Regions:
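Sec-dependent signal peptide recognition
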Residues: 7-15
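C-terminal motif of bacterial Sec signal peptides marking the signal peptidase cleavage site
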Residues: 21-24
Length: 334
């Protein structure tokens, strides 16, 4: 079974009103995490036991790739707010601007960093993706041998038909699901630095604390804390995998980030990558599960969320951060 975090459950209950994966926040602290509820969908008036279906068929105008970024909310990290490689500039100071930044980069096939643990991106498609029982969609990362920075995948069906990802998120099962070292509802609070060019401090729901290191020699922007987050602290909630990264050299010069077996983005898996040279990871809607680990039957999905699953850092390489380059419907045809 998973290790489920109850330590700060009362705190989360008081400060969050989770709305379909995006959390409401109080005036002092922002909270972002998966929906705690798992409703089956709105009722059909003619048959209350049958959920309404808002399935969106493909049309002649449809495309295989994602068509919308609904929310880009990274954790702090070395590429956040950074111009040279991160592609940010001084205009990215609102959530809308951040979403547009992410979409423009992904449309060009350029990676977007999710930062440290809990950072995420939500994308949608112009059609519903069918559950075929096999691999249904893929997310592109930038992993390579000994450099895997796994991101967990969540899926959502547009249950209320409003075209927005405000219904129920379901986590997709991966190779680490059910292990004692995997922690559900793991929460990290990030703190805005009081001075420029400083590390970002964090505390977690396990009573631990640490920092996102400031790597001035490589990324010297003033802040690694997202400029569009208005509050001085914010919380990211998700499922945490046990870190596997280690310093092979023993001198801090050569860090290895081993592969996880399967089920994660930006992971150099020999199982779910379609070819040896591919950086795409394939996913099955049939691997969806509820918060208790029970299988969930979804005929289709409309939205995908990718979230950094590791809270760790690798010396001069910095924080372990999932990168996303795109997402597409594997079985697309019209």
């Amino acid at each position: 079974m998973w290790k489920f975090n109850y330590k700060n459950l009362a705190k989360w209950a008081m400060i969050t009103l989770l709305m379909g994966g995006f959390a409401a926040c109080n005036s002092d602290e922002d909270v972002f995490g998966p929906d705690a509820d798992t409703p089956s969908g709105p009722s059909n008036p003619s048959d209350p036991s049958t959920p309404v279906s808002y399935y969106r068929p493909k049309t002649s105008e449809s495309k295989a790739t994602f068509d919308q970024v609904y929310q880009y909310m990274p954790a702090p990290g070395q590429f956040i707010n950074e111009l040279k490689t991160g592609g940010f500039d001084s205009t990215h100071t609102t959530q809308e601007a951040a979403n547009l930044y992410a979409k423009e980069r992904l449309d060009k096939g350029i990676w977007v960093s999710l930062g440290g643990f809990g950072g995420y991106i939500v994308v949608g498609f112009d059609h519903s993706i069918d559950n075929t029982g096999g691999y249904d969609f893929a997310v592109i990362g930038n992993s390579f041998n000994n450099s895997s920075e796994p991101g967990i995948v969540w899926v959502m069906q547009d249950e209320n038909g409003d075209g927005l990802p405000n219904d129920t998120w379901y986590e997709l099962r991966g190779s680490e699901t059910g292990k004692e070292t995997t922690i559900q509802n793991y929460a990290v609070t990030y703190y805005r630095p009081e001075t420029v060019q400083s590390p970002v401090k964090w505390t977690d729901s396990e009573g631990q604390s640490g920092e996102i290191d400031y790597l001035k020699a490589y990324h010297n922007q003033d802040y690694y804390y997202p400029l569009w987050v208005e509050s001085d602290t914010y919380i990211l909630v998700g499922t945490r995998l046990e870190p596997k990264n280690y310093d092979q050299s023993g001198k801090g010069t050569y860090w290895v980030l081993p592969t996880f077996d399967w089920g994660y983005v930006d992971n150099f898996s020999s199982i779910d990558r379609p070819t040896e040279k591919s950086v795409d990871n394939r996913f099955r809607i049939s691997d969806a599960m509820d918060q208790n680990g029970n299988a969930v039957s979804l005929a289709y999905i409309d939205f995908v969320k990718v979230q950094t699953a590791i809270n760790s850092k690798s010396g001069w390489l910095g924080e372990v951060s999932t990168e996303v380059v795109g997402a597409y419907d594997i079985n697309f045809s019209y």
